[in-house]
Amino acid sequence: MFNTHKVEIEWGGRPLTLETGKIARQADGAVLATYGETAVLATVVSAKEPKPGQDFFPLTVNYQEKTYAAGKIPGGYFKREGRPSENETLVSRLIDRPIRPLFVDGYKNDTQVVITVLQHDLENNPDILSMVAASAALTISGVPFMGPISGARVGYIDGEYVLNPNIDEMPESKLDLVVAGTSEAVLMVESEAQELPEDVMLGAVMFGHKSFQPVIDAIIKLAEVAAKEPRDFQPEDLSELEAKVLAVVENDLREAYKITEKQARYAAVDAAKAKAKEHFFPEGVEETEMSAEQFATIFKHLQAKIVRWNILDTGNRIDGRDLSTVRPIVSEVGILPRTHGSALFTRGETQAIVVATLGTGEDEQMIDALTGTYKESFMLHYNFPPYSVGETGRMGSPGRREIGHGKLAWRAIHPMLPAAEQFPYTIRAVSEITESNGSSSMATVCGTSLALMDAGVPIVRPVAGIAMGLIKEGERFAVLSDILGDEDYLGDMDFKVAGTEFGITSLQMDIKIDGITEEIMKVALEQAKGGRVHILGEMAKAISSSRAELGEFAPRIEVMNIPTDKIRDVIGSGGKVIREIVEKTGAKINIEDDGTVKIASSNGKEIEAAKKWIHSIVAEPEVGEIYEGTVVKTADFGAFVNFFGPRDGLVHISQLAADRVAKTTDVVKEGQKVWVKLMGFDERGKVRLSMKVVDQETGKEIVAEKKKEEVDAE
């Protein structure tokens, strides 16, 4: 019934298996991939024909994690998986980025790649395996995909590169780098690093590229026995039509791309396009040399050609800069004084308002992952409203791009955050992109660094980011610093580097062509370093280190530790005690399993009141100390006084006053505040208190006062 094919190799010390022919046989391509005991299913389906009028390639990648893969049942009312998590969105993008440029130009059939995590061994992260499985499924599907590709994770532990470190090893690693590519070239890099130098980062990229070659060989081996017949697709030859359009629009486009202001430049390009349309689609003529879709494709291609020729021939860019110059920068902090920390970062026509907000443990994000539930105390959210590019558009929940850009900035900042013991706050940074003309994610990095310093978050060092680009024709190439939106769209590489003056904290690279050598990447990294240091210098004009104090409106958090066996006393039955403390003092309280107690409030008196209350619950009263208490009950033989948190003690009638007392209620009443001295404990452990040795007005010991008076008299 099944015509199965399987390839198995040893990779990174674990078995990797690729199997097809048994599951999802109606898909164009389907591969079950297993690494260790983690298993994923990748499927590919591509429409037989493009939709009429389609002028782009509609590729969708969906990575989905099923909770059954880790032996779990989803939470929530419906008990089933819902909308994609942030991690699922990020992994979908991670797979999309290296496979998209490998589809043949002109292929516009609706294509969907679905990767499902079926089993997770809690050791091997399924993201790399999913990339491998998707590549294998595409390679055997018959669609015009110029792969295969593979990917690898590279760690850096004790000065050595580690291939595909398992989940338990990652906390020891100074690097979390994912690299993907073909047998000849690197196509994609995504990473977070602990201030590593450029040569270590480049070495990791090349180590990963070399390490995944056996996987590419395994995919080719599988395709040799299991691949479907390639689809009969021939890219349309538009060279003759392109030459005709070029003759009409070249001068207009060259003039348009000399305009430095973005909106004016776009208007000039639109005018050139409209003029060419009039020429090739005269009014009233039904039969034309080309279709509207062909014209749109050609015009986009010519835009790229004009810009690229100009840069390579003259070294001058669209806005008049040379290759390595960064646009003018203005940094401001404290622009929203009621917030905890704020910054406005402007670089050319790209601008971000970033606001930092500090919270308590209650504000931490709960993340329910396949590996278990954990809390995240640092959140960075990136918003890209349509007005930032002068357009109208959809508003609402963040899209894949916004989630991806936010995570890139998060990776850049995260290594520089203080330890929780040093700074026990939950931090949320929100970047509102108010203008965009290239590299808004790197503006977010710079703005977040400024806003955190303005908020008084003691980051290790300021972080800046820069986006690099590449134009390559044959042996000629130009590396561009701080690229514009057009240079990103029309170029061959998007290369984002963030870090401090001492090293890289995040690197993201997307390459659209083959032939990007190690030498070119080295040039780009060195040029990026110069740009990053320049940007840090510009940022320092606004603020160079974290403020010594938190903002006026930020909450204060103090930390105290209590014995773990006292946690239940502080919480109380059903949370009764801790709720009372919160209600009476107004402070927020978070108690962790190890006995760490975080008390937060914007009012210092509330924090002190809560600390004092908790201390009274967990501490033991000391014999000979004087305490303030409240009479809770009277009896013939004395009064019971609550004096130390939940503790009560007896003041015997003989200890109520210096003179003889006939009746307890002659001296005290229930609810009365009194001063008592702890005299000791009886043979049954009951507390013995005395009021008569304490001045009820001052709370000072009477005997001690008399002795002091005697000493003073002498």
Curated annotation (Swiss-Prot):
Any Gene Ontology biological process: mRNA catabolic process
EC number(s) given by UniProt: 2.7.7.8
Alphabetical keyword list: Cytoplasm, Magnesium, Metal-binding, Nucleotidyltransferase, RNA-binding, Transferase
Binding, Mg(2+): 488, 494
Molecular function (Gene Ontology), one example: 3'-5'-RNA exonuclease activity
Localization in the cell: Cytoplasm
Ranges for domain S1 motif: 624-692
One GO cellular component term: cytosol
Xref: InterPro entries: ExoRNase_PH_dom1, ExoRNase_PH_dom2, ExoRNase_PH_dom2_sf, KH_dom, KH_dom_type_1, KH_dom_type_1_sf, NA-bd_OB-fold, PNPase
Pfam families tied to this protein: KH_1 (PF00013), PNPase (PF03726), RNase_PH (PF01138), RNase_PH_C (PF03725), S1 (PF00575)
SUPFAM superfamilies found in the cross-reference section: Eukaryotic type KH-domain (KH-domain type I), Nucleic acid-binding proteins, Ribonuclease PH domain 2-like, Ribosomal protein S5 domain 2-like
CDD domains for the chain: KH-I_PNPase, RNase_PH_PNPase_1, RNase_PH_PNPase_2, S1_PNPase
Reactions that this protein is recorded to catalyse: RNA(n+1) + phosphate = RNA(n) + a ribonucleoside 5'-diphosphate
Stretches assigned to the KH domain: 555-614
Cofactor(s) needed by this chain: Mg(2+)
Family per similarity comment: Belongs to the polyribonucleotide nucleotidyltransferase family.
Functional note: Involved in mRNA degradation. Catalyzes the phosphorolysis of single-stranded polyribonucleotides processively in the 3'- to 5'-direction.
Name this protein carries in UniProt: Polyribonucleotide nucleotidyltransferase
